[in-house]
Amino acid sequence: KITADELRSMRWFGPDDLRSFGHRSRVKQMGLHLDEFKGRPVIGIINPWNEMNTCHTHFPQRVQDIKRGILEAGGFPVELPALSLGEQLMKPTTMMYRNFLAMETEELLRSYPIDGAVLMGGCDKTTPGVLMGAISMNLPSIYVPGGAMLRGNWRGETLGSGTDVWKYWAERRAGNLDEN
């Protein structure tokens, strides 16, 4: 176990110099008091959520749960939004962007006063992206899988997350239904 003075975040907040004075004043500017986080591990929550990614629609609530857990464990949580890779709507393919997410994850963890990370993900490319970035940074991290994508409903029937599109596309092509 490391001491409070050994925390990586103390490089930003600990020294009695101009730069750290500036860091502390900016955090106060955000409405935080130094006692809320000084001496506690600052835990970055890498959250690849956006409103276009159906894999992660439940992440806003999950982030709140993670924050509560970090606080209860004695840490200080900060959410760090990251590139969201939703296979369903991104063109031409999310594979092109997976390495961007890895680089962004690494740089978010490197450039901010972060002592450890909670990595969130769920889609095919999000999971390896956040893991590769955190591994490159070599900080204590834990991965929280998003779980299954929320399913939809249509005409009273529960739809699968991706398989029903093929069934209903065949029905549409056969002239048995329209898009309404």
PLM regions: where:
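Glycine-rich phosphate/diphosphate-binding loop of Rossmann-like nucleotide-binding domains
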Residues: 35, 44, 50-84
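Active-site cavity-forming subdomains of large catalytic enzyme subunits
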Residues: 95-180
